[in-house]
Amino acid sequence: MWTNVFRIGGLHNVSWFQFLPSETELNPGFDRSSRAEQNEVATYLVLSSHLRLQKEGFLTTWTNSFVGPWDPSQGLYNPDEKIKLWLFLPGRHSSISDKAQAAVSKLRVVASGIWVAPGDSEEISVAFSQSLRNCIERALSGISYMRFGDVFSKFSPQSEEYLRRGQPTVEFIFAATEEAVFVHVIISAKNVRTLSSGDAERMLRSSLKNSSYRLPAFRKCLGLAKSEDNRLCYINTSHRPMLFPPVIVSPHGMRGSLTGFCPNDLVKQVYFSSGNLKTSTGYVGLPSHIGRGSRLINGNHCYVEVTLGCCQNRNDNTSQANSTFAVNLPHNQCPEPSVGSKDHRKGQSDLSSVCEKKFIYPAEAVLVPILQSAFAKFSLKRAGDFDCLGASENKSDGFYEKNGYNSSGSSRNSSISSTSSASSGSGWRMTSRTGDLDADADSLTCRQSGLTCNDDRLKMGSKRPRTGMAESFGQVGIENDQIGWDWDADDDDDDREVGMDIKALLSEFGDFGDFFENDALPFGEPPGTAESHVLVFPPDSADVGSSPVDMMDVSDQIVLPVGFSSFESFNPVPPIIDECLIKSQEVLHSSITSVPSNQMSISSTGEFDHLLKAEAMMTFAPEYGAVEAPMSEISSTFFKSPYLPKSHKVESSNSRTSNYVYGATPPTTDSDGAGDMILFGSKSCIGNNAGRTLYHSREHYTQVEGRKGRHDKLPTVISDNSSTKEGVSQSIHSKHSAANAVKVVQGKKTDGISAVVSTLLSSKTLLATDVGSVMFQAFMCRMRHIITSSKHSSPVSLTRLSGNFFLNQLSNEPSTLTDNISARNEIYKKDIPTRIAGDFDGGMLDSHMSAPVGVWRTVSVPKTAKPASSPNIEAGSSLPHSSFSEDSLLSYGQRQPLQDLLDGIALLVQQATSFVDLALDSDCGDGPYGWLALEELWRRELSCGPSAGHAGCGGTLASCHSLDIAGVKLVDPLSAEVFPSSVITLLQSDIKTALKSAFGQSDGPLSVTDWCKGRNQSGDGGSISEGFTAESALSEVNGVNISDDFIIDKYFGKQAVSNAIDGGKGDETAQSQDIYSSELLRPTLFVLPSPAILVGYQDDWLKISTNSLTHWEKAPFEPYALPKSINYAVVCPDIDPLTCAATDFFQQLGTGESTSLSFVKEVMLKHDRNWLGTHLPQSLGNQMEKDVGRLSSSGFVLLDCPQSMKIESNNTSLLGSLSDYFLSLSNGWNVNSYLKSLSKALKGLKLGSGLYTNQKEGSGSPCVVVYIVCPFPDPSAVLRTIVESSIALGSVIQSDRDRRSILNSQVARAFSSSTAVDEASISHIPVLSGFSVPKLVLQVVSVDSIFRITSPSFNELVILKDTAFSVYNKARRISRGMPNDAFFSSSLPSRSSSALTPMNSISGIWKDCGGSRMTGSTHPRDGEIDVSLRTSGWDTSTSWQIPRSGGLSCDPNRNGDFYLNDEIFYLFEPLFILSEPGSVERGVSPTFTSLGSESSKPIPEDGGRGSGPGMNSMEGITSGSSSQGDVSQLEGKAIPSLHCCYGWTEDWRWLVSIWTDARVLQQGCQILQACSSPDNGSFKPRDFVITRIGNFFELEYQEWQKAIYSAGGPEIKKWPIQLRRSAPSGIATNSNGSSLQQQDLSLIQERASSTSTLYSSHSKQSTFVKGSMGQSAGRKQIMGGQTISGTPRGLFQWVHSISFASISLDHSLHFVLPAELVSAGGGQSSTGMSSVNYIEGFTPVKSLGSTAFSYMMIPSPNMRFLHPSPLQLPTCLTAESPPLAHLLHSKGYAIPLSTGFVVSKAVPSMRKDSRINVKEEWPSVLSVSLIDYYGGYDNAHDKILQGIVKQGGGTKETRDFEVESHLILESIAAELHALSWMTVSPAYLDRRTALPFHCDMVLRLRRLLHFADKEVSRIPDKTGV
């Protein structure tokens, strides 16, 4: 078996040097340089040195980080931020080599040292990792690979427009052991392509059809009239840019917009031959000897122009609400949305920076993202929103004419589009100012999806105002990003049309009465305005993978005059405009773009009159002279009435034609410096500084003055209030404000470096060079660190925070179809990751399913009456607790957010801790929980840079954009399928060649065993012959089968073991010493069987495979616990099609009779068999019930809804019901109205006293299940339904009002506390329990399930089973707090005690059918549970508890004590449990073919892990030969370990923890309570495993360490294994718990010094574990506020070991197995692995995705990744981040001691059942990293290790560290992997997730809690938003 790992030698010791610029280089002789200029020069020095070193073959990189402490009080920017250079030299060096010295001559060394593999510094390791990637880049460029951030793709010119298969891409991440560095080569495929000739053709066609605004185009390349000198001619006819397709550019992988093309010869003539632009590095693109890019234009090679960058708006009062300034922005650039209320537009403008840049790239350096049609059909919730390349851009392709999203694009929702009404925009997000849009094509300039625009170009003059054009349809946070022209901005008393607008032009021109009358067009108004029509182009203009294109809706077909082919007929010889006028497009975002309308006084508009005139002259042919109206005519109505009937020609003194250049030959200049080169031969273009700020409006225009100056051939910038001199334009890339602008006094000169920097950062278009690209990337990286206030504009990705929360939140507004069902499509469209934005290739996404392709369709948008007070949806704050406007509030009266949250928290926990819930888990991970994960990921994309430019996150294509914090794969529209054959072929060819070239000493791709061994191998590790599987390699190393079971006698015989145990040493030779030494360092490689589950069967328990769940009703199986009686009520909207379908659904759920499918009738809950229990309707009548007839008696509670929705359904077919239902929803109901009715209905339910535990009845009383039918299918509506239902029901069942009030006050006090934590109140931190709910179950049923249209498509029986199983697991009946007599007097029968008799391995309460979990334990198993909690007659009672008490456990009066009577917990009664804990005991050492065969069997009794009494999992595992006695003699009945996973919510307000044990049997609190009894001598210590998702923070771990040493006192010294071996700073190992650090001692002076009552019979032992986790680093104490001096042993008398591990899903490993190893029947192949070699094209290969087994792999020596969180987005904190977040991140992540992997069967991916034929899934890989361990050995194990140490020499610390870590890690990993199989269900037979279920629940609960916290925290007052 091959891996994708390569080994690099010679890098185990590396010298590193860190550089910063020399101070002398930053002061070039005068002291007037600004700080910003120094920063830019410093950046240039560092980056140019880096590129030079890289070119010469050195390992080098640059990093941008904060030097010194972060001090937000210093303003928006950290003053100490610098760009640093790193140089790595293999070996030990005290100085830099002479070869490198020249490149760093202008830098100074600020730090240096030696990096010793695997490294112990996160910062150095990350920099080293990046330098290795840079080195590989050089090698790959020689074989035609281009770099796009962290992703590499091979350039291959394509003749086709798109590929059906994705483009292969390569990523590299790096790991290290003590001896070598390993490269993990991640092969994937992306839906991208290179540029094609069709792109140029479409751009040409688009420019011709819209010549009123033509693309900046080269006449030569577009085939237009050629100028005599072939100079570039920009036809810039308007300041309004056209919207261009997004592209991804090399080398940084940033997202940009394609804006032009140019042939090779022209670029060479201008750049390469002129010699004016010199660079010390090189140009972006493939090396010249390889060749250039595609032949895009007339069979010739071509360069392209790409616009990169963004803009930042940092003022909290510059909202784009209802404004139109966005229409004046340069290409694809929008101001960052100001997220807040509409009142924000009244503030002052204060743009912080402007950053846009145009680069000229070779075609091979540009990729175009595409979307395959099949994926679009699949992921309707995500795929329509093409702002994944930058959410704020939201621009459609200028030439990809798709738009007009009016339908769902889904077959099941096809009826939605047919009933479309009201607006054609994204109605639920638009700003409604003037009522509905007119039902014509012209009004459809908005984008219905929130993304696209039917015609986003300049509208030709129209005399009729278009109501609704002011509507804005951007994403949430960008709602008011104007699309199209605002022809009627007459509303809301605002004059936002500041700057260039069509009305300004028309004001200059006056009446259009005879403007267009000539021979070409004999009519009196511009084309397209007589009627409401818009041009629509054929479908070939789209670039979607061969799918239909959704076209513009028009009323009828229009036939244009012949002369209207383009505007060329108006002006046969159009003037050639010099490029200097294009500066108006290159200087970004002056106050024109974001100043609120009322900030632009009318008196100031005259200042721009000459500019308006110039704009007009640029727009129209010269024979039509400009006209100008006196100011008196346009003063107050300048932006109101675009037509002035008395206008007349006036030559303004400010508008002299001599000031503007129109000729083909531009004015000459005597400036020939590098800093003054203008694109394509144009001469210097003078920036108008005018002594104003960079953001002044006039700087959008360039004025050529007659006076020129020259000073030493370098341009200067003149700071003057009245005139502008020639000079270099001010840098637009500096992040400083106007006060920090570059101020170069005339007559002074700058040095060459400053000139180069000015050139690179000027506003001019430049050829893409290495240094220019990296300079721009570095600038964008710095920009992402801007600290933004919650009231300020947020980086674009953060605007998604409240994105879909706005769904249907227009209160008091009759909703239309768009408001409800089509809104789901908007959700589908919204949620494509931010990096793929723009409306590229997406016209087909929501095409009408029955619409013809490429034809005209009429616009018939019926108007829907809206109230005059229809509110505007404004953007809410993107930061916590102010995310919503008043219009998004649920109007349920005055809400109390905190009280609501506390009411609903128990039921929220119930929902999140369900193993599988189809309502939340459907859509292949794209359901509500997937939606929450995506939202969280987008909020983390601050690291991507401003406007999601993707400068600092690894590029647009990086895998980190589709992985959540746990490594779970999320929806990624760019992801494509990659096949094992492609992977191994690429690894064996290009990658192998490149790594050999880059590093010389490179072996690979390694076999599994070679990778696990991690040491030098004989021969060429990269040869084809090394492509064995792990089995063959294991058997061929010196003839020894190196399994990882450490069974010593397997290799050395029993005598050697005996010698080791006896301590014999006299007869051993040096050879045997080496053998022993190598034995300690062997890798782990095991084949593990898939875990089985335990269910009930008749009066016994049965061990079955997880696949058997599909046969539940046929077996018939029974639940592991007892049957449960269920009384249910269904709350359903009173919509006839829905109620009919729901009635049928719940009847089948209860009786198992299916009317639509011919499956078995007795399904699940059939009461006569009592398989799960009874399921009967119960009338919970309330005032809502009226005229419900049979529904009332059937347990239905109907919600009131608008009368217009109550349509009678006469359809009996499913399709008819669907059509009727969607038609009903289109009649005016929205989510807000539904939730209001739902809340009222739930609060009125007569639940009665039956919910509360009756001690006499015990568990015999039935549970009440409330089913909520959610009528809206979109994820946010389902989530909001859950939140509102939980709150409403929680308020009903809450009985203890006094306790509730106390809890509310405590939580409120905790939230309102100051930054400085009051240590005295630590003991009063509220801890909320998620399982104090009585016999009540909340189950939301989606409309998809009701209509049986789930995605993926489950059959009806599966849906019913999963729903029933989910309800069964949620139902809890037995109270842990009731008296024991009542507890055990249940009337329900238990399993027969005789059933336990034949299972001799079982004792006490354990239900098992197999052997012990881990044999060989020295501790007896009897009495694991406190005898007071069980009796001999109830052996099975307490085994139904699950430690899913989920971090939310609570006693408001907790002061170190826990009183059962204060809070009652209800025990978990599971449907099934694991038959045995995960363990390597039953693992198999792989042989030659076991990995490829399903016939592997456990190793025989005498030689394998599967037999013999091994060690307890946390104690280490002994060899098989050391325990030859009987199992019973060693009392090897192991006690399951306790597992805890915890994590913080995103806003760091809540800590969530979930407990379980290795078999999902016991509840952690229950066991800990039993531990606390001093009289319980039979209870044995347990192993504790503390798990963190992702990584432990170093400070976080140190706090754990302090707690352990403080609590354990001197007992800690007695634990023989402490892997880190050092006590925390300030903690003495002989401490009795009171000798803490001095600052900590002061915190507990006022606490009681008496013996803690924590260990009394009623104490809650979980206080320490849970309480300490919830405390911030460095300050928190333990044990509920009392000292533990009187109890020196503390908790640890019941703790055998404590382990800390981090967990995530790994995507860095590929495993490829020769397919011929497995015969058709699954048996072993006759060829054997040893004879199989890979031959490209002839050796069939497969992945491990379909394997029946799991594989555990732990490399040796201990391996760790150089980057602590590979494939994860970088974390960027802001001033809004809580102090705890800053504190924990300050020291980075804890470095793991060892990392292991468990490879198992593939979990259904996002693409499964998505109409994509996925031939083979890749396996799921669980990564487990050991952080630390405290514990001990058993005697046998200790003797063996001591014997080996004596034989091999050396100390125990140096010889057994790795074997200890391996033994511990493999046991932990096995248990964690087994816990993932608890998520199996009939719908997910291969598990729902590969994460352990308790870790997955932490993810779900923390996200749901965060969502609920924000949902209830909406503030009704606008000012609070």
From Swiss-Prot:
Phenotype upon loss of function: Abnormal embryo and cotyledon development, and embryo lethality in most cases. When viable, plants are small with greatly delayed flowering time and sterile flowers.
Ranges for region Disordered: 400-434, 702-724, 1485-1528
TM region positions: none
Covalent crosslink: Glycyl lysine isopeptide (Lys-Gly) (interchain with G-Cter in ubiquitin): 220, 226
GO cellular component, as recorded: nucleus
Tissue expression remark: Ubiquitous. Highest expression in the shoot apex.
Coiled coil region boundaries: none
Cellular localization per UniProt: Nucleus
Database matches in InterPro entries: Mediator_complx_sub13 (IPR051139), Mediator_Med13_N (IPR021643), MID_MedPIWI (IPR041285)
GO terms under biological process: regulation of development, heterochronic; regulation of radial pattern formation
Main location: nucleus
Biased composition (Low complexity): 407-427
Composition bias, Polar residues: 1486-1496, 1515-1527
Keywords of the record: Developmental protein, Growth regulation, Isopeptide bond, Nucleus, Repressor, Transcription, Transcription regulation, Ubl conjugation
Its biological purpose: Component of the Mediator complex, a coactivator involved in the regulated transcription of nearly all RNA polymerase II-dependent genes. Mediator functions as a bridge to convey information from gene-specific regulatory proteins to the basal RNA polymerase II transcription machinery. The Mediator complex, having a compact conformation in its free form, is recruited to promoters by direct interactions with regulatory proteins and serves for the assembly of a functional preinitiation complex with RNA polymerase II and the general transcription factors. Acts closely together with MAB12.
Entry's family note: Belongs to the Mediator complex subunit 13 family.
Oligomer status and interactors: Component of the Mediator complex. Interacts with CYCC1-2 (CDK8 homolog).
Entry protein name: Mediator of RNA polymerase II transcription subunit 13
